[in-house]
């Protein structure tokens, strides 16, 4: 329980308020500014370069705690040119100089998969990453958010950062998702309802039967895209599924945090899972969401299954179930979110099914999601992607990106056009 440090009384708050109260060592309510202790800090190959440069400009010699800094190489991994290779070499040297043990080389996977797999995403913790989708870790009951390189340099140096405690939304999804409807569909549906700026700088807490029934992987998909509605973070209260996932992998002890019954929310929303069918986010905004039936038949040049949103084992299994015994009609790129995911998919036969269906397998990492390599689009080409963003130019300046679930992506790969997965 957290107490009101000014009055000595019981402090009733949201999950975010409680986590910041613990991290700041004082009562922290929505809209307060606090200097908080960061539990874990992450910067990948794309952002660590800027953060390290800023750290050096501060004339700092040693990071505050090497054991609480995580550096995965995932965005341009393997390096796509000499410039990237040189920058990555410099970061490797810095990591070695600083004695940072939590360094994950090319091929180990995407930061937002690697951190949970290695037990850094923990209930009640304040986890900060130099990447906007760091909100993924809220799936484990952490307050997790992204910051810029200068802020990350400050964390590297001191382990602390100023925050404005966000106001909170409470989103409840009652009922169960129907067959053929997945966490990605639920996520896109909520973004469509909220809008890309509808939750700006809010912490969104997710509740309801549909949320409780999501797997850990499904919750990661949901919280990963909280930023796409403008949120500072998305949080699922931890439960037995969370604790089971963390068993034998948690990097530290942790104390789960839950909102109190009298916690104050800026707004509360309730949705019915039965209203949700397969969803597609159409170009060029993530909130341009439509039921798959409204865009069914749209020509597709490429399908991409992977990313920090939907590159986990269960995502690959869903795609494999759709493709089993069949052949893709268009080029289809599959990139597991991590080496661990890839090995598991090999061991249970999922990867064999996908490869026999004609997909192209690439190194675990971000792949073409950010438009750097491994499947960027040509002028006028259309891609159905399981990623989290479809902005103009995201995967190539002339491309068109439709965001969908692994099931919808796989079904579209079979037909060469956007297809309802329930029909194949």
Curated annotation (Swiss-Prot):
Lineage: Archaea, Methanobacteriati, Methanobacteriota, Stenosarchaea group, Methanomicrobia
Family assignment from sequence similarity: Belongs to the aconitase/IPM isomerase family. LeuC type 2 subfamily.
GO molecular function annotations of the record: 3-isopropylmalate dehydratase activity; 4 iron, 4 sulfur cluster binding; homoaconitate hydratase activity; metal ion binding
Protein name per UniProt: Probable methanogen homoaconitase large subunit
EC number: 4.2.1.114
GO BP terms: L-leucine biosynthetic process
Subunit architecture: Heterotetramer of 2 HacA and 2 HacB proteins.
Pathway annotation: Organic acid metabolism; 2-oxosuberate biosynthesis
Domain of life where this protein originates: Archaea
Record-linked Pfam families: Aconitase
CDD domains given in the database record: IPMI
Role: Component of a hydro-lyase with broad substrate specificity for cis-unsaturated tricarboxylic acids. Catalyzes both the reversible dehydration of (R)-homocitrate ((R)-2-hydroxybutane-1,2,4-tricarboxylate) to produce cis-homoaconitate ((Z)-but-1-ene-1,2,4-tricarboxylate), and its hydration to homoisocitrate ((1R,2S)-1-hydroxybutane-1,2,4-tricarboxylate). Is also able to hydrate the analogous longer chain substrates cis-homo(2)-aconitate, cis-homo(3)-aconitate. These reactions are part of the biosynthesis pathway of coenzyme B.
Keywords in alphabetical order: 4Fe-4S, Iron, Iron-sulfur, Lyase, Metal-binding
Organism this protein belongs to: Methanosarcina acetivorans (strain ATCC 35395 / DSM 2834 / JCM 12185 / C2A)
Top-level EC class: lyase
Catalytic activity: (2R)-homocitrate = (2R,3S)-homoisocitrate; (2R)-homocitrate = cis-homoaconitate + H2O; (2R,3S)-homoisocitrate = cis-homoaconitate + H2O; cis-(homo)2aconitate + H2O = (2R,3S)-iso(homo)2citrate
Residues at which [4Fe-4S] cluster binds: 308, 366, 369
């Amino acid at each position: 329980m957290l107490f009101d440090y000014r009055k000595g009384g019981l402090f009733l708050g949201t999950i975010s308020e409680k986590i910041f109260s613990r991290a700041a060592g004082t009562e922290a309510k929505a809209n307060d500014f606090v200097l908080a202790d960061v539990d874990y800090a992450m910067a990948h190959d794309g952002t660590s370069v800027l953060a390290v440069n800023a750290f050096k400009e501060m004339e700092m010699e040693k990071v505050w705690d090497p054991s609480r800094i995580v550096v995965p190489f995932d965005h341009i991994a393997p390096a796509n040119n000499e410039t990237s290779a040189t920058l990555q070499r410099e970061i490797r040297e810095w990591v070695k100089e600083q004695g940072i043990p939590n360094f994950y080389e090319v091929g180990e996977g995407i930061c937002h998969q690697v951190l949970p797999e290695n037990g850094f995403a923990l209930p009640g913790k304040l986890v900060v990453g130099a990447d906007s989708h760091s909100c993924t870790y809220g799936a484990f009951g952490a307050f997790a958010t992204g910051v810029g390189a200068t802020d990350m340099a400050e964390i590297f140096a001191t382990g602390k950062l100023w925050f404005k405690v966000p106001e909170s939304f409470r989103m409840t999804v009652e009922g169960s998702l129907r067959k053929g409807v997945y966490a990605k569909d639920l996520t896109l549906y909520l973004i469509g309802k909220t809008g890309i700026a509808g939750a700006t700088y809010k912490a969104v807490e997710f509740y309801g039967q549909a949320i409780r029934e999501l797997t850990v992987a499904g919750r990661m998909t949901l919280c990963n895209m909280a930023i796409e509605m403008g949120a500072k973070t998305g949080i699922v209260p931890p439960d037995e599924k969370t604790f089971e996932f963390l068993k034998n992998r948690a990097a530290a002890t942790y104390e789960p945090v839950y909102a109190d019954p009298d916690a104050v929310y800026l707004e509360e929303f309730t949705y019915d899972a039965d209203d949700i069918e397969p969803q597609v986010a159409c170009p060029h905004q993530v909130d341009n969401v439509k039921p798959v039936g409204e865009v069914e038949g749209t020509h597709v040049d490429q399908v991409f299954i992977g990313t920090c949103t939907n590159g986990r084992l269960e995502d690959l299994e869903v795609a494999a179930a759709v493709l089993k015994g069949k052949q893709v009609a268009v080029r289809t790129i599959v990139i597991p979110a991590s080496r661990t995911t890839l090995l598991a998919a090999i061991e249970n036969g999922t990867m064999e099914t996908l490869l026999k269906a004609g997909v192209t397998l690439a190194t675990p990492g971000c792949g073409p999601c950010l438009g750097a390599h491994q499947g960027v689009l040509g002028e006028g080409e259309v891609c159905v992607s399981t990623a989290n963003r479809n902005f103009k130019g995201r995967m190539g300046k002339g491309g068109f990106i439709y965001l969908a679930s692994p099931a919808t992506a796989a079904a579209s790969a079979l037909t060469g056009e956007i297809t309802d997965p329930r029909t194949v």
